[in-house]
Amino acid sequence: MTQEREKAIELALSQIEKQFGKGAIMRLGADEALPDVAAIPTGSLSLDLALGVGGVPRGRIIEIYGPESSGKTTLALHIAAEAQKMGGIAAFVDAEHALDIGYARKLGVKTDDLLVSQPDTGEQALEIAEMLVRSGAVDVLVIDSVAALVPKAEIEGEMGDSHMGLQARLMSQALRKLTGIISKSNCCVIFINQIRMKIGVMFGNPETTTGGNALKFYASVRLDIRKIASLKQGQDVIGSRTKVKVVKNKVAPPFKEVEFDIYYGEGISREGDILDLAVEKGIVDKSGAWFSYGGDRIGQGRENSRLFLKERPELVNEIEGKVYDVAGIPRKGAKEAA
């Protein structure tokens, strides 16, 4: 590329960033994420690294979508638990009226400190969300789910009435109002969304998310979460192998994919996730079926090695620290909760 063209493109990039903000455009091959982006860990180290900043960014809108029972709420609750560990406040707007408090507690959420709202209408849910964000004291706000944000007119109307585009209009208006105050308050707002099928699509992906197109534009990070296999112990299904694709990312290069295990009643397997990453980065050696770390054997087979690590949290923390060092991402600490 000639010097003049290089100069011209640099000028265009700087103008785009000036007008639309840092991260509006970036080179796909560039490894660097946006500098100094405060983030909250997701509970999965591999996903934290795929997001490029060590977790979901603060002061941004995040969308987590996928089919039913794919782990959307589990991932959102893990993020809420991580925010609480850092000394922050988490809120959960339960529009689906389906939050399982016992399960949230098992994932590490301090349920006594969790702010929970079960609104009657979509308008009420989004107004509550706006007031919580405006307070400036909430670190993570989860809205579960966009599909359950039913407009008041639809609730008060008859069962067969048509309400075309009402929910999309509601979301569009709410996001226009919310996006500015979310940025100022440094709150991470997570919208959980469901998948629908577009009718009559012959070519391309027939899947779409509910609530119109506004959320697709306003979200800084969009995560597509899918169950790809069942985890079995004998004949019993004890969990699922889950794949997450970073479909959109305005704080680091997108399109990265990760896989991790979600166990029923336990959530994301931290030890299994760290073990997979450590093998990938060459921190843990895998020879045949044996896993070894620092010359010592951890176990034979992945499951035995995972259970060995589960009983030794200090060893897990040590390996996790080395993974962060190799990845070149600073470890997220309590200092960021302020």
Swiss-Prot record:
Subcellular location per the Swiss-Prot or TrEMBL entry: Cytoplasm
Keyword Transmembrane helix: no
Pfam families per UniProt: RecA, RecA_C
Highest taxon of the lineage: Bacteria
Keyword hit for ATP-binding: yes
Similarity comment: Belongs to the RecA family.
Protein known as: Protein RecA
